[in-house]
UniProtKB/Swiss-Prot annotation:
Residues 459-553, 568-691, 710-841 form the DUSP domain. It catalyses: Thiol-dependent hydrolysis of ester, thioester, amide, peptide and isopeptide bonds formed by the C-terminal Gly of ubiquitin (a 76-residue protein attached to proteins as an intracellular targeting signal). GO terms for molecular function: cysteine-type deubiquitinase activity; cysteine-type endopeptidase activity. Residues 912-923 have a biased composition (Basic and acidic residues). CDD domains: Peptidase_C19L (cd02668), Ubl_USP48 (cd01795). It is found in: Cytoplasm; Nucleus; Cell projection, Cilium. One of its GO terms (biological process) is proteolysis. The modification N6-acetyllysine is found at residue 973. This is Ubiquitin carboxyl-terminal hydrolase 48. The keyword Phosphoprotein applies. Residues 616-627, 924-940 have a biased composition (Polar residues). The keyword Phosphoprotein applies.
């Protein structure tokens, strides 16, 4: 099919030869493209918008073939949420609770612990016996033991693929959005559980934590002098093994039990010798628990950075661990089998993900527990190889080779071993009846949900099949051919064929013209379909209005024909007018604006389009929608403000403008052609005189300009020094022969000088408004010390407050000589006279001077103004401050911030060989200054820092300085984050100071720290001394670690 523009031209080509009154039905059907050939499927690739008979590519392709039933719904198979046979149940990750989930799975697969918890008395039994379970109430565990009971029962017999542990997490008071130290959680929870179970009467329940996890070791100290041995016996629930510098688990255990020498200042006080003696100390394992927890200390405190870091070194461990060599008492079996490996994915101590590899004690098969997902390992061997490749480490340490029965990991942080004798002696743990009843109820809810989801899927499939049959039937009957037809919106047809959206009633209102018929311009978004198909659509979906053959609008077609013919005539007239303008004009002509002549064709086209639009709006509707008359008036008003044809030569009085450069004469013939398109345009024959009022105003303007020049010259001659800003008085160097000075507003001076420089462009200044310098009581608002400057034009209306910060930013007064004041009173009207008189006090020291003002100072108003300005400096938003980064400039930091100590490891040679500022830091590559200038900047910056106090309204940036937008209520920590983005310096590497004061309270606001707009803050960055893998977690690093403070683990 031809392109859309070609179809548009073809539909209206007949209008070139047919007059509006001769338009027939055939012309109307041609304009509406009734008889265009329909497109064929497979030939036409996409829908032809210019052809109402093209029904290809409207979304039918998805319905005309075989359709998979699953495409009729968006509901997942509920059986995907069902627990797989012979598998375990997962736990939902509530945000950052993966570390909790891993320990819950490890403890669940400890059958002895599970059995003991099932034996605990519970309020659940009362709930099942009463009306709780039958009354439809949800069971809410009351204690930690009850939460574990219910969780373990669900993990054992639930039909769900995963369960929600939010009740257990909420009972502990854990923050689900904050990742915590998994090893600390394990210790605290075991302590809490032991304390809770210690109150039980059943010894199997009361002592289960000690029996399963508790061992004993002794700190043994031997005096080298007398050989006396002292023991301190302690219980342990896990062994914390240092992995730094080791490659095998056995090496870590050996170091844990290694003998330590106590010598020198660390000597041991021997009670037998009654003095300090050299001694040895070591740990002896006295007894080992059934379940041996080995904590690998992967997360350690880094003294250099002041934060935790993760050790990503590989540690080798075996599936079988013989602890007999490490135990003092050799009786019994001490061979352990590996039962769980807890993994931390990630290179940082502040982020990552926790998973667990746990062995089923009954089948001996290994499973990977990853929150909701449970994966069974192939065979009966532990597989960590894939796990170790998930997180690439920055260190390129190669993974060591592992022998049979051994494994290596750089992410394992806890190993759980079970005593081999107990590992093989397992019986099935039964869920108590009262807990099983709760599990059955939860399973019943799950089954009901599965049935409900399956029914919803079935309903969606049935609806989809019915829609499929409807589309296959109706699409074949859509083409109208020579049969009776109707028009339907293309958008509605596409939505009817779109399975993802419900079909709404047909709405053709957007396609109507002002005559409530089908608009010819809207044919591109309509489709012509058979009357048979239209009847079915309207009977099933409703809507309207129905657009039959009677909806073809003859009035719109006739009007469009008229406009098209006028446009064709306009092209011919445009060429004729251009030719007439080039030829020599004979006889009288007409004045036409040059701007109108350049754009008359465009104006005529716009006028024709406006007429076409007004025809559409004639019945109060636009495209079927009600037309707002108020909006129409506003649009017309805006259009009227634009100049119409030949209005560019009208003067303000509606007559011919006196500016001859903006118009030209055209011939009578050219004007006649132009007047056909603009009959209401202003007409000015060549003999018409220009506007008489404008001529008078022009003469008066010339006279006023001459008068202004004369006044300006007179005032300049009378006040030459004031105009040129020379020989100005100042209070600090008061002339001996002058007793009084006067004050005027600096605003008056600016306006007066502007007039004197350009009297033709500015109005004369006739008065001086000094009242603006006074308070409402008529008193002065500034003190005399603030006027004692090097130059009176730099005077500020307020003095500095204590601390050196200026309290005013604008200079608004000037001092006047008495002789100048006499002349000013003659030339201008002065509303308020402000006079300062000097009086010398004392006969011995005449240099002591007092100043008396008329009017006098108003202390109350001045104090109020000072307080207001102080408040404004402390309460600002989106103000600009400047941060200056100091690099290799130790002297500057010492001078401006003595509290900052430079690293003591720097030698004198390093100081001498320090490169210029710009050679090491990219933030300094902002200036092309010479090396000589860089060398002098060290001394100059101290002076610059002092000059910051005398800040002007315009700050001049220097090298290594960046502007930041801040607010007074913003904390220092938030400012450090901004500085980090601007300078790529981590907050913990930033040393900030302002006027020699160190900024170190991260929680304080900038307002309380004395940071005001236009302040300059010095930034000294610490040199990087380690690989900051935790740079991505800098926001979390900067926050103080609170651990499990405020949770149930610490008895909140």
């Amino acid at each position: 099919m031809a392109p859309r523009l070609q179809l548009e031209k073809a539909a209206w080509r007949w209008a070139e030869t047919v007059r509006p009154e001769e338009v027939s039905q055939e012309h109307i059907e041609t304009a509406y493209r009734i008889w265009l050939e329909p497109c064929i499927r497979g030939v036409c690739r996409r829908n032809c918008r210019g052809n109402p008979n093209c029904l290809v590519g409207i979304g039918e392709h998805i319905w005309l073939g075989e359709i998979d039933e699953n495409s009729f719904h968006s509901i997942d198979d509920p059986n995907c949420e069902r627990r797989k046979k012979n598998s375990f149940v997962g736990l939902t990750n509530l945000g950052a609770t993966c570390y909790v989930n891993t320990f819950l799975q490890v403890w669940f697969l400890n059958l002895e612990l599970r059995q003991a918890l099932y034996l605990c008395p519970s309020t659940c039994s009362d709930y099942t016996k009463g009306d709780g379970i039958h009354g439809g109430k949800d069971y809410e565990p009351q204690t930690i033991c009850e939460h574990l009971q219910y969780l373990f029962a669900l993990l054992q017999n639930s039909n769900r693929r995963y369960i929600d542990p939010s009740g257990f997490v909420k009972a502990l008071g854990l923050d689900t959005g904050q990742q915590q130290d998994a090893q600390e959680f394990s210790k605290l929870f075991m302590s809490l559980l032991e304390d809770t179970l210690s109150k039980q009467k059943n010894p199997d329940v009361r002592n289960v934590v000690q029996q399963q996890f508790c061992g004993e070791y002794a700190y043994v100290t031997v005096c080298n002098q007398c050989g006396r041995e002292s023991k301190l016996v302690s219980k342990f629930y896990e062994l914390e093994l240092n992995i730094q510098g080791h490659k095998q688990l056995t090496d870590c255990i050996s170091e844990f039990l290694k003998e330590e020498r106590l010598e020198g200042d660390n000597r041991y006080f021997c009670e037998n010798c009654q003095s300090k003696q050299n001694a040895t100390r070591k740990i002896r394992l006295l007894s080992l628990p059934c379940t041996l927890n080995l904590q690998l200390m992967r997360f350690v405190f880094d003294r250099q950075t002041g934060h935790k870091k993760k050790l990503n070194a590989y540690i080798g461990f075996s599936e079988s661990l013989d602890m007999e060599p490490y135990v003092e008492h050799k009786g019994g079996s001490f061979v352990y089998e590996l039962s769980a490996v807890l993994i931390h994915r990630g290179v940082s101590a502040y982020s990552g993900h926790y998973i667990a590899h746990v062995k089923d004690p009954q089948s001996g098969e290994w499973y990977k527990f990853n929150d909701e997902d449970i994966e069974k390992m192939e065979g009966k061997k532990l597989q960590l190889g894939i796990e170790e490749d998930l997180e690439p480490s920055k260190s390129q340490t190669r993974k060591p080779k592992c022998g049979k029965g051994t494994h290596c990991s750089r992410n394992a942080y806890m190993l759980v071993y079970r005593l081999q004798a107990q590992e093989k002696n397992h019986t099935m743990v039964q869920v108590p009846a009262f807990l099983q009843e709760l599990v059955d109820r939860d399973n019943s809810k799950f089954e009901e949900w599965c049935v409900e989801m399956a029914e919803m899927r079935k309903q969606s499939v049935d609806k989809g099949k019915a829609k499929h049959e409807e589309v296959k039937e109706l699409y074949q009957r859509l083409p109208a051919g020579a049969e009776p037809y109707e028009f339907v919106s293309l958008e509605w047809l596409q939505k009817w064929l779109d399975e993802s959206t419900p079909t709404k009633p047909i709405d053709n209102n957007a396609c109507l013209c002002s005559h409530d018929k089908l608009h010819p311009d809207k044919i591109s978004i309509m489709k012509r379909i058979s009357e048979y198909a239209a009847n079915i659509f309207y009977s099933r979906y409703g809507g309207g209005p129905r657009l039959t053959v009677k909806a073809l609008c003859k009035d719109c077609v006739v009007e469009r024909c008229r406009v098209l013919r006028l446009k064709n005539q306009l092209n011919e007239d445009y060429k004729a007018v251009n030719n007439l303008l080039k030829s020599t004009m004979k006889g009288d002509g007409f004045w036409v604006g040059k701007s109108s002549l350049r754009s008359w064709r465009q104006l005529a086209l716009e006028q024709l389009d406006e007429q076409d639009g007004e025809a559409e709006q004639s019945n109060g509707k636009i495209n079927g929608s009600t037309f707002n008359k108020d909006e129409s008036k506003e649009e017309k008003k805006e259009e009227e403000e634009e100049l119409n044809f030949n209005e560019d030569i009208l003067c303000p009085h509606g007559e011919l403008s006196i500016s001859e450069n903006e118009r030209r004469l055209v011939s009578q013939e050219a004007w006649s052609k132009l007047q056909q398109y603009f009959p209401k345009a202003p007409e000015f024959p060549s003999y018409r005189e220009c506007c008489s009022q404008c001529k008078i105003l022009e003469r008066e303007g010339e006279e006023n300009e001459a008068l202004h020049k004369m006044i300006a010259n007179e005032q300049k001659t009378s006040l030459p020094n004031l105009f040129q800003d020379k020989n100005r008085p100042c209070l600090s160097n008061w002339p001996e022969d002058t007793d009084a000075l006067y004050i005027v507003s600096h605003f008056f001076l600016d306006e007066w000088r502007k007039f004197v420089r350009k009297p033709a462009r500015s109005a004369p200044v006739s008065s001086i408004g000094n009242a603006a310098l006074l308070c409402p009581h008529g008193g002065l608002m500034f003190t005399f010390p603030s006027l004692t400057k090097e130059d009176s034009k730099l005077c500020q209306p307020l003095e500095r407050r204590e601390g050196g910060w200026p309290t005013a930013a604008h200079n608004n007064i000037a001092l006047i000589w008495p002789s100048e004041w006499q002349m000013i009173q003659k030339l201008f009207v002065v509303d308020k006279v402000i006079k300062i008189t000097r009086i010398e006090v004392g006969d011995v020291n005449p240099s002591q001077t007092q100043y008396i003002s008329e009017p006098s100072l108003c202390p109350d108003c001045r104090e109020g103004l000072l307080c207001q300005q102080q408040r404004d400096l402390r309460e600002y938003t989106q103000a600009t401050i400047y941060v200056h980064k100091v690099v290799d400039n130790k002297k500057v930091m010492k001078d401006s911030a003595p509290e900052l100590n430079v690293s003591s490891s720097e030698t004198e040679e390093d100081k001498e060989e320090a490169k210029p500022d710009g050679e090491k830091d990219p933030d300094f590559n902002q200036s092309n200054g010479s090396t000589k200038r860089q060398k002098t900047s060290q001394q100059g910056y101290v002076a610059y820092q002092k000059q910051v106090i005398r800040r002007s309204t315009r700050h001049r940036k220097v090298r290594g300085e960046k502007a930041l937008l801040v607010s007074a209520n913003q904390t220092l920590k938030e400012l450090k984050i901004q500085i980090m983005h601007a300078f790529s310096v981590a907050p913990f590497d930033q040393n900030l100071s302002i006027d020699g004061k160190i900024l170190n309270d991260d929680c304080a606001t900038l307002g309380t720290l004395g940071v005001i707009p236009e302040s300059v803050i010095l930034l000294k960055a610490d040199e990087p001394i380690a690989d900051y893998a935790a740079m991505d977690d800098v926001m979390q690093v900067c926050m103080p670690e609170e651990g499990f403070k405020g949770t149930g683990l610490l008895g909140h």
